[in-house]
């Protein structure tokens, strides 16, 4: 039987859901769950990427047989910058961190929101990736 694994990592927990077809119907079973949360790292709310990676691997190991594929869903706005060799060059600061409180107003001075919205269709939310990344240049 072919199985497919979905890994959903949210702000407070993560879970692994195994799916398969049985008699033409989709079956789903939660096989692994873990707690999650951003932690203070030098005054910033950050995700513990090493622990999250370990939790994903542990959840895959909880499958009785290797799934045909694995899909991972996380937050839409957070990121980690990587160096040329693939090493992390900054922490994974969480979207809930307060560092972007004033950024939309600052960025609006050089990049109008109407232009951003026209290009992306994304509402102005202070935690959007564009505002996080713009901190590097403001």
Regions found by a protein language model. Give the residues of each.
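Glycine-rich phosphate-binding/catalytic subdomain of phosphoryl-transfer
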Residues: 61-136
